[in-house]
Amino acid sequence: MIANSWTRSEYYRIKAILDEKIPTRMDLFKMMNVPQYLSCIEKSRENIFKQYLDTLEEMGELDAEELVLKNDVGGEFLHVLETTLMQKTYKMVILKAFFNNGNIKMALTEKDILDVWKDFFAEGDNWKDLGVESYQDFLGITDEQHLTNARKNPIKHLLLSGQGFFVERPGYEIALAEELKDVVKSDILIKHFGDIIEYRISEYFRKKSF
């Protein structure tokens, strides 16, 4: 069993508040009581956020289309996104560039990465994750320095540890494997892709605030 009793109780409480709509990861993140949330993420095997589709299936909450996705390459891809190691937000920024506001790109150019990277780190205090002392120092980083950072950190590690879903492609900085070209058009995958990115960034900053 993945979800412990506290997590299940919270899930159904939040689902009732949402008029019986299946909660997203972000719904749960925002609405779970703190003790229950911390209990949920304390042990990997009980952390529903690292295996949300499996959790929904276990609880009888997965619809037929999501079940097909879960048992196919799309489900494997989403699980990689849920579980990839994350010491900083860098990987999530690259994933945001792929996500492209719901119009998923199969490959990223320098410009694709720079646009999302600079926008993300210019927002609020996100620039602090780059290890600079001030916002002015952030503004002084050149495009080539940003790209070097992206290449040697998130891009390198996604290529190495992305279970083959992230690949090199001539003329691009990084690409998705061809086996994903059809599934990335799925509204269900798009929904979960965006939800995972938003949750993982939110959880990262929650942890960092303590």
PLM features per residue range, with description:
Residues 1-210:
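Intrinsically disordered, charged low-complexity linkers and terminal tails
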